[in-house]
Design a protein with these regions (language model features):
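Conserved core of the sugar-phosphate nucleotidyltransferase
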Residues: 4-94
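Hydrophobic helical membrane-anchoring modules
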Residues: 79, 91-92, 97-121
Length: 121
């Protein structure tokens, strides 16, 4: 399953997900992007301490689901009613593939990516 709102998913990422699930090692696969940002929750830093503020590159590896690609077995949907298994295969994608259009600002960003990287005159 890919979403029209994630227009830059590559064939290579799709193939990785399909291969992982078809191999039988995983019931599902989905795209993720590494998030190296200072995160806060309930007024407190979530992934660092104020006593030791690291460089963003040194923050712990945290991944965000990109909503760009989901591959799963029919058994997973039928038996558990969901698209992500307990042990999913994570397909790490770059920032361009991770682009997901949910609002006007996202569309402006996607349009700029398209015009910069993919548009042929």
């Amino acid at each position: 399953l890919t979403h029209a709102t994630a227009p830059f998913m590559t064939a290579q990422s799709i193939e990785k997900g399909v291969e992982a699930v078809v191999s039988g090692k995983y019931e599902s696969a989905h795209s993720v992007a590494m998030l190296k940002e200072f995160l806060w929750k309930d007024g407190k830093p979530l992934n660092y301490t104020l006593d030791s503020i690291p460089r963003t590159q040194d923050l712990p590896d945290i991944y965000t689901e990109t909503c760009g690609l989901y591959v799963y077995t029919s058994d997973l949907i039928l038996n558990k009613g969901r698209r992500i298994s307990d042990n999913p295969f994570l397909i790490e994608v770059n920032k361009i593939e991770a682009c997901d259009i949910n609002d006007d600002d996202d569309f402006v960003i996607a349009d700029a990516i398209f015009n910069s990287k993919f548009k042929t005159e």
